[in-house]
């Protein structure tokens, strides 16, 4: 099954300096699963991906700098790299000044191998969430979501009050207005960084629990 990891935080510096934290995160998650070990530049073809050398910190920082320079607006996003098997790997997404000035975001769309590992191991899910929350403090909100759950129909149903993708595991900052309600609904709470990681039931039941919000 495919999973999506995403975190939104308050940036501590400019996008390039935030890139150094992204590089630290890459180094920290590499040992967690074989598909996270080798990171390559995003490519337009399979052949190009196969021929590309692994990314370096300098490559990542230059990629962010170039994206910022060529963007017409202060807010911009980019997909600089992927890890794992070509065509079935894990895609890295970054955003800056979105949705608000000073915000920064990181996302990881898992491939088949890492997705299957997350299906089988809650410990891996917890470690991935904890590592991400620790590196990107101060965080605002984050989550780990399974992609097969239906998307909420916002024309029919109200959006979640926290205005974020609902997740099996979610991070809320301790000063978040949603922290208390998360505490009431969670089946497990693990303090970390400037808040806590909340687990809502199981990968199958978390949408039902969060719909009580």
Range-by-range predicted roles:
Residues 17, 22-90:
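N-terminal low-complexity, intrinsically disordered segments
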């Amino acid at each position: 099954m495919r999973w999506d990891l995403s975190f939104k935080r308050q940036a501590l510096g400019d996008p390039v300096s935030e890139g150094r934290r992204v590089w630290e995160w890459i180094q920290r998650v590499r040992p967690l699963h074989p598909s996270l070990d080798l990171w390559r530049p995003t490519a337009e073809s399979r052949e190009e991906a196969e021929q590309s050398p692994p990314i370096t910190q300098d490559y990542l920082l230059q990629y962010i700098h170039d994206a910022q320079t060529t963007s017409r607006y202060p807010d911009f996003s980019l997909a600089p790299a992927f890890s794992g098997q070509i065509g079935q790997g894990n895609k890295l997404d970054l955003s800056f000044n979105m949705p608000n000035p000073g915000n920064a975001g990181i996302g990881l769309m898992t491939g088949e191998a890492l997705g299957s590992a997350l299906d089988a191991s809650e410990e891996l899910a917890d470690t991935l969430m904890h590592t991400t929350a620790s590196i990107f403090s101060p965080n605002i909100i984050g989550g780990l979501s399974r992609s097969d759950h239906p998307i909420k129909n916002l024309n029919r149903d109200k959006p979640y009050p926290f205005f974020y993708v609902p997740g099996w595991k979610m991070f809320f900052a301790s000063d978040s207005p949603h922290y208390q309600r998360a505490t009431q609904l969670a089946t497990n709470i693990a303090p970390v960084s400037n808040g806590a990681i909340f687990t809502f039931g199981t990968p199958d039941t978390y949408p039902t629990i969060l719909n009580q919000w």
